[in-house]
Amino acid sequence: MSIRCVVVTPERTELDREADFVALPMFDGELGVQRGRAPMIGRLGYGVLRLQTVSGPERYFVDGGFAQVEDDVVNVLTGRAIPVDLLDNDEATKTLAEALDMPSSTPEQAQIKDAAVRRARGQLRASR
């Protein structure tokens, strides 16, 4: 028995797969989902979405967003979903350095910098 995982970005549906298990990178930790899980809605963090499919494991970096689980369907709404194999460690390191150099003298700048650093760190972890 499997569950369906659908990942949607503003541009298109990035993924629509049957999986035995889905691990979601929630903002406060990882959440595992299998068939029969109780319905829920939650906020995603920056991290790796993992699926265990019949053909093997799949991993995607997701750029925050929201997840909904209902009736053995996992719906993920995110800004970006990138297969981990396509991430470049050097580029992720550069992005993190740029985020750390952002100004943070006002509350608005600090909030923007914090989000950029969290995003870059998540992408760097995923690229390893």
Swiss-Prot record:
<dbReference type="GO" id="GO:0005524">
    <property type="term" value="F:ATP binding"/>
</dbReference>
<keyword id="KW-0139">CF(1)</keyword>
<dbReference type="Pfam" id="PF02823">
    <property type="entry name" value="ATP-synt_DE_N"/>
</dbReference>
<dbReference type="GO" id="GO:0005886">
    <property type="term" value="C:plasma membrane"/>
</dbReference>
<protein>
    <recommendedName>
        <fullName>ATP synthase epsilon chain</fullName>
    </recommendedName>
</protein>
<keyword id="KW-0472">Membrane</keyword>
<keyword id="KW-0813">Transport</keyword>
<keyword id="KW-0406">Ion transport</keyword>
<dbReference type="GO" id="GO:0015986">
    <property type="term" value="P:proton motive force-driven ATP synthesis"/>
</dbReference>
<keyword id="KW-0375">Hydrogen ion transport</keyword>
<dbReference type="GO" id="GO:0045259">
    <property type="term" value="C:proton-transporting ATP synthase complex"/>
</dbReference>
<comment type="function">
    <text>Produces ATP from ADP in the presence of a proton gradient across the membrane.</text>
</comment>
<comment type="similarity">
    <text>Belongs to the ATPase epsilon chain family.</text>
</comment>
<feature type="compositionally biased region" description="Basic residues">
    <location>
        <begin position="118"/>
        <end position="128"/>
    </location>
</feature>
<keyword id="KW-1003">Cell membrane</keyword>
<dbReference type="InterPro" id="IPR001469">
    <property type="entry name" value="ATP_synth_F1_dsu/esu"/>
</dbReference>
<dbReference type="GO" id="GO:0046933">
    <property type="term" value="F:proton-transporting ATP synthase activity, rotational mechanism"/>
</dbReference>
<keyword id="KW-0997">Cell inner membrane</keyword>
<dbReference type="InterPro" id="IPR036771">
    <property type="entry name" value="ATPsynth_dsu/esu_N"/>
</dbReference>
<dbReference type="InterPro" id="IPR020546">
    <property type="entry name" value="ATP_synth_F1_dsu/esu_N"/>
</dbReference>
<comment type="subunit">
    <text>F-type ATPases have 2 components, CF(1) - the catalytic core - and CF(0) - the membrane proton channel. CF(1) has five subunits: alpha(3), beta(3), gamma(1), delta(1), epsilon(1). CF(0) has three main subunits: a, b and c.</text>
</comment>
<keyword id="KW-0066">ATP synthesis</keyword>
<feature type="region of interest" description="Disordered">
    <location>
        <begin position="98"/>
        <end position="128"/>
    </location>
</feature>
